[in-house]
């Protein structure tokens, strides 16, 4: 699927990045600063959240060890100082970006500098990372001829179809005034449809589909200049999509600029990232500042699996105060809970990986619009998805790592972090509730508390008035107390 934005003519003569070091002063945008907050993740037009700028420091490590990372050349305070095309500036203005966020101040000069350098960025959701790598992609593409407009030059990969669609929406909004820009999606399609040849300048997709399309020659990658991996820790983890990403990269030009962004980088993944993106500049939020703010973390004791379900039904009225996501471990559990709750007259929808892509699209769009307020999901939604109305996340099943040769059950800390990050997004207030029904789940919950040095408060299910009071007060409290610390990696 391709999207073309027919608007006024853009300058010709190669990519914008070729002109960054000597910007034409006549190209300075006169677009007035908009009123309102900056946005990241999904733009406001797609139901996304505002940018959240907590107090944090950005640490820069340059690949050139002789260079000074504090040099003013590696920081920028205004988008106009980057020599950006006025049409891109106009797109930024439409997204309510008045000035670069802290991460953008440091990332954009490094991304846009010539010759292009690889970048590895660790930055939590809501700090402007999506806009940063999209802006770089828009600036690198050459749209001077019709042939180049139909030639893939930038590739953005995401772990799921849902996140890829969200990023594609950001590209469309930011690039809406750029003449000749064509955007293509390389995501799983319904079983009865065949992928068409991609004739576009920027491609957003998932690694498996991109790899298949390159092999079938419906995606010709030989002119690609930029490769971006969002949620890169998951994309490069050998337990996840690592093999697919390696195969895709092997099919791309060797001199391609590689950009990796993620909220978390476990040590073993960070070591591999340095090989995937060699000689990269690195940008990191300082360790102690990696927090999820405004999330009240609670847990409920349940007698057994059936009591979990009855507890969930009891919570239904609270789940619909805003929008809520119920995370389960398996597709079968999602389907069974949806079946039972629907049969009892509750309105819920489920989203799992095996559903046809068109059905998944319809469900997530329905959830964004608020037509469905309770969504049951597997980890397909745990990363990156930005829906501004989500006020509660239920960990029906505590996320765990499957380690066949390791005794006992091990909590998956990073998935927990990403799951609860779906609520309380970018300064909003949210609630996370974990269900505990046996000793092993209790031990995993304790592992999470120890790892993140946080307290998860027990709520007594014998007094549902108290449960309701605690949750409603938290959701309505505009100054919820952040209690979630940064973790160990």
Curated annotation (Swiss-Prot):
Coiled coil feature spans: none
Q: What is known of its domains?
A: The Q motif is unique to and characteristic of the DEAD box family of RNA helicases and controls ATP binding and hydrolysis.
**Domain of life (superkingdom):** Eukaryota
Record motif DEAD box, residues: 230-233
Query: One Gene Ontology cellular component annotation?
Result: nucleus
Q: Where this protein primarily resides, as one coarse class?
A: cytoplasm
Show the InterPro entries listed in the entry. Answer: DEAD/DEAH_box_helicase_dom, Helicase_ATP-bd, Helicase_C-like, P-loop_NTPase, RNA-helicase_DEAD-box_CS, RNA_helicase_DEAD_Q_motif
Name this protein carries in UniProt: ATP-dependent RNA helicase dbp5
Residue segments, region Disordered: 1-51
Please state where this protein is localized: Cytoplasm; Nucleus, Nuclear pore complex; Nucleus membrane
Which segment of this protein is annotated as the motif Q motif?
Answer: 77-105
User: What catalytic reaction does the record list?
Assistant: ATP + H2O = ADP + phosphate + H(+)
Keywords of the record: ATP-binding, Cytoplasm, Helicase, Hydrolase, Membrane, mRNA transport, Nuclear pore complex, Nucleotide-binding, Nucleus, Protein transport, RNA-binding, Translocation, Transport
Cite the record's note on assembly: Associates with the nuclear pore complex.
Membrane topology reported for the UniProt record: Peripheral membrane protein
What top-tier enzyme class does this entry carry? hydrolase
């Amino acid at each position: 699927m391709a999207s073309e934005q027919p608007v006024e003519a853009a300058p010709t003569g190669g990519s914008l990045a070729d002109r960054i070091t000597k910007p034409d002063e006549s190209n300075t945008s006169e677009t007035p600063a908009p009123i309102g907050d900056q946005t990241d993740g999904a733009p406001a037009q797609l139901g996304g959240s505002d940018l959240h700028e907590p107090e944090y420091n950005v640490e820069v490590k340059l690949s050139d060890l002789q260079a000074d990372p504090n040099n003013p050349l590696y920081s920028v305070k205004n988008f106009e100082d980057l020599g950006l095309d006025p049409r891109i500036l106009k797109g930024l203005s439409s997204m309510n970006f008045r000035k670069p966020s802290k991460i953008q101040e440091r990332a954009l000069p490094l991304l846009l500098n010539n010759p292009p350098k690889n970048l590895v960025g660790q930055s939590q959701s809501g700090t402007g990372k999506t806009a940063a790598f999209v802006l770089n992609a828009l600036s690198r593409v050459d749209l001077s001829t019709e042939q180049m407009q139909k030639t893939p030059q930038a590739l953005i990969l995401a772990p799921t179809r849902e996140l890829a669609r969200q990023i594609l929406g950001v590209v469309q909004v930011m690039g809406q005034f750029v003449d000749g820009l064509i955007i293509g999606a390389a995501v799983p399609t319904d079983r009865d449809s065949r992928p068409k040849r991609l004739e576009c300048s920027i491609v957003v997709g998932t690694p498996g589909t991109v790899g298949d399309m390159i092999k079938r020659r419906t995606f010709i990658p030989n002119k690609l200049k930029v490769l971006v991996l969002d949620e890169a820790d998951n994309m490069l983890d050998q337990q996840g999509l690592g093999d697919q990403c390696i195969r895709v990269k092997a099919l791309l030009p060797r001199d391609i600029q590689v950009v990796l962004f993620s909220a978390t980088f476990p040590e073993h993944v960070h070591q591999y990232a340095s090989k995937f993106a060699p000689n990269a500049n690195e940008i990191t939020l300082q360790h102690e500042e990696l927090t999820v703010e405004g999330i009240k973390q609670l847990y409920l004791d349940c007698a057994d699996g059936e009591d979990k379900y009855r507890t969930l039904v009891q919570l239904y009225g609270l789940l619909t105060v805003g929008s809520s996501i119920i995370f389960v471990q398996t597709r079968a559990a999602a389907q069974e809970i949806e079946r039972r709750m629907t049969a009892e007259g509750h309105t819920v929808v489920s989203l799992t990986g095996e559903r046809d892509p068109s059905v998944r699209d319809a469900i997530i769009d329905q959830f964004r619009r608020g037509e469905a307020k309770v969504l049951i999901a597997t980890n397909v939604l745990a990363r990156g998805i930005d829906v501004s109305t989500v006020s509660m996340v239920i960990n029906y099943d505590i996320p765990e790592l499957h380690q066949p040769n390791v005794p006992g059950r091990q909590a998956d800390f990073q998935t927990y972090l990403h799951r609860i990050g779906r609520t309380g997004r970018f300064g909003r207030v949210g609630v996370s509730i974990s269900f505990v029904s046996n000793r092993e789940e209790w031990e995993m919950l304790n592992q999470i508390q120890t790892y993140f040095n946080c307290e998860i408060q027990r709520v007594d299910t014998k007094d549902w008035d108290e449960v309701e009071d605690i949750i409603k007060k938290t959701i309505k409290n505009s100054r919820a107390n952040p209690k979630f610390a940064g973790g160990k990696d």
